[in-house]
Regions:
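N-terminal glycine-/serine-/threonine-rich beta1-alpha1-beta2 phosphate-ribose binding loop
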Residues: 1-33
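Catalytic cores of large soluble enzymes that bind and process phosphate-bearing ligands
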Residues: 7, 16-20, 48, 71, ...
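Rossmann-fold NAD(P)-binding glycine/threonine-rich loop
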Residues: 21-34, 43-70, 75-86
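Short conserved micro-motifs on helix faces and helix-strand junctions that flank
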Residues: 32, 39, 98-99
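Substrate-binding/catalytic subdomain of NAD(P)-dependent oxidoreductase enzymes
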Residues: 110-111, 118-198
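Hydrophobic beta-strand scaffold residues
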Residues: 38-39, 66-67, 131
């Protein structure tokens, strides 16, 4: 419906997507093909299949449609634009060292400092640090999305299946509190090695 409505618009149109909705992201290809610009914080379209990533960028270029997703990685720092500029100059980064998840960094710091894992998750959620569904963070899905967007912006043709992560929670655990003992043990193991969780 939106595409049909936008087809009659004489003025340039920009769609701003501040959701985490795949249903909204599913419209990107049609909107770009219609000449609409897109500004998005939604990671789903850019972190899906590599073929989808390439289609979106090809459509944006072919139709002169601005396509901006800077806020998907780095909390709106001008990181992706800088990476793309390096690639355009032939100086593509070959390595990144980064904290890709502020929420996971916060969680691990709280657990390291003695808070139970479940309490740290509740606190991070109350502070608005996690995704609306904290499993996106705890199962590292949000982190993988950021990594894919960053790597693809640097020219790497990665598929989601090529990224290996260790989720912070066991999907089979009936409740988050079931993870407290595991994380307490991990803190003690790290401390015994003179290390910290990070």
């Amino acid at each position: 419906r939106l595409r049909a409505r936008l087809a009659g618009e004489a003025l340039p149109t920009v769609i701003v997507d501040c959701t985490a909705s795949d249903a909204v992201a599913a419209g990107y290809e049609d909107w770009l093909a219609a000449g609409c610009g897109i500004v998005t914080a939604n990671k789903l379209a850019n972190a899906g299949s590599l073929a989808r990533w390439r289609r979106l960028h090809a459509l944006a270029a072919a139709h002169g449609s601005p396509y901006h997703y800077e806020t998907t990685v780095g909390a709106a720092l001008p990181l992706l634009g800088s990476v793309r500029a390096l690639v355009a100059r032939g100086e593509a980064p070959t390595r990144f060292e980064a904290v890709l998840s502020g929420s996971l960094s916060y969680l691990l710091a709280q657990v390291q400092n003695g808070l139970s894992f479940s309490a740290a998750v509740a606190q991070a959620q109350a502070l608005g640090l996690t995704e609306p569904d904290p499993r996106e963070d705890l199962e590292c899905r949000d982190l993988v999305r950021k990594l894919l967007i960053l790597a693809r912006s640097a020219g790497a043709g990665l598929e989601p299946s090529q990224v290996e992560v260790e989720p912070l929670v066991d999907a089979a655990a009936p409740r988050i509190e079931a993870m407290d003992v595991r994380w307490d043990a991990r803190v003690r193991q790290a401390q015994a090695r003179g290390e910290r969780l990070a």
